[in-house]
Amino acid sequence: MQKLAVYVYIYLFMLISVDPVALDDGSQPTENAEKDGLCNACTWRQNTKSSRIEAIKIQILSKLRLEQAPNISRDVIKQLLPKAPPLQELIDQYDVQRDDSSDGSLEDDDYHATTETIITMPTESDFLVQMEGKPKCCFFKFSSKIQYNKVVKAQLWIYLRQVQKPTTVFVQILRLIKPMKDGTRYTGIRSLKLDIDPGAGFGQSIDVKTVLQNWLKQPESNLGIEIKAFDENGRDLAVTFPGPGEDGLNPFLEVRVTDTPKRSRRDFGLDCDEHSTESRCCRYPLTVDFEAFGWDWIIAPKRYKANYCFGECEFVFLQKYPHTHLVHQANPRGSAGPCCTPTKMSPINMLYFNGKEQIIYGKIPAMVVDRCGCS
């Protein structure tokens, strides 16, 4: 017993006699290790960001059913982009992205993009339709997306040349049909009288929903339309084949479709910034810049907040499924650890040119990370 007491005293004396400098030196590797850990975390986050951006590029093309990015230059876009109210409203009032995480819901989106608005420019017909010896405007080809969705609106937009004095213009929209026995080759869609003030040109929309629905039911009946807009002197003011200085004034169709809303569920997670020292699974900010990719075919948004997930996942931290922890407890060696992944994602609206030089306004699902968690 006395020997044991002696050993205890000697041990305590050695602890008290330890050089304090030695203790300080011993703590230095710990500080260095912490700094190295922070640097490694920054590097890993940067790699995660780069991977996320590349994945986004692939996802956008895939969800839009594009094999590759449309090769449309800025000069071509300037010529094709209609100068009309509906498109300008989409650009000016464009809801780039709502980063509202207060609702805590998760949309069960389909994988592919949901189309909301399609702007179709006139194109060459598969067959030559002539009236009075010359080709007439306009023929429209329709995306397959329109045929499988409910059409809620279809507007034909036309542009009238400017006048020098107050003028009354008589507008006729005619639908071309196969020649009848009496020689008739068209039927009326709409007639209207417009009073135009002098100055800039004038844009006018005409409801063609019924005509479009008939074309979709019977594609062979789509032979095109003719646009007439004469003033009192018989001068045609309709811009059907734009001349010099009339780029973007082509007639076009604005078609809006609707889709069934998706169900949602609740979820929660952590938010961090780039200077955060949080080691747990967290959502970090990430802005995707399409102009930096050279993707001029995307009209809007030019950039959006995509965000990404990064961090460690312990088996008891923010697990998406409760049984994950139970499986690990039952077989800790045979089960992989949970990963930090998105648990809530939301769509973005996008205005873009497709491969056929049509302007599409649609919703691309699961492009914004709203919540991160371990699962």
Curated annotation (Swiss-Prot):
Cleaved propeptide residues: 24-266
UniProt signal peptide: 1-23
Ranges annotated as spanning the membrane: none
S-S bridge residues: 272-282, 281-340, 309-372, 313-374
InterPro entries given in the database record: Cystine-knot_cytokine, TGF-b_C, TGF-b_propeptide, TGF-beta-rel, TGFb_CS
Primary location class: secreted
GO cellular component: extracellular space
Alphabetized UniProt keyword annotations: Cleavage on pair of basic residues, Cytokine, Disulfide bond, Glycoprotein, Growth factor, Secreted, Signal
GO annotation, biological process: muscle cell proliferation; negative regulation of myoblast proliferation; negative regulation of satellite cell differentiation; negative regulation of skeletal muscle satellite cell proliferation
PROSITE patterns: TGF_BETA_1 (PS00250), TGF_BETA_2 (PS51362)
Coiled-coil zones: none
Subcellular location(s) per record: Secreted
Molecular functions per Gene Ontology: cytokine activity; growth factor activity
Domain of life of the organism encoding this protein: Eukaryota
Annotated SUPFAM superfamilies: Cystine-knot cytokines (SSF57501)
Repeat as UniProt keyword: no
Sugar-bearing residue positions: 71
Family according to the record: Belongs to the TGF-beta family.
Assembly mode: Homodimer; disulfide-linked.
PANTHER family linked to this entry: GROWTH_DIFFERENTIATION FACTOR 8, TGF-BETA FAMILY
Function: Acts specifically as a negative regulator of skeletal muscle growth.
The name this protein goes by in its record: Growth/differentiation factor 8
Organism: Anser anser anser
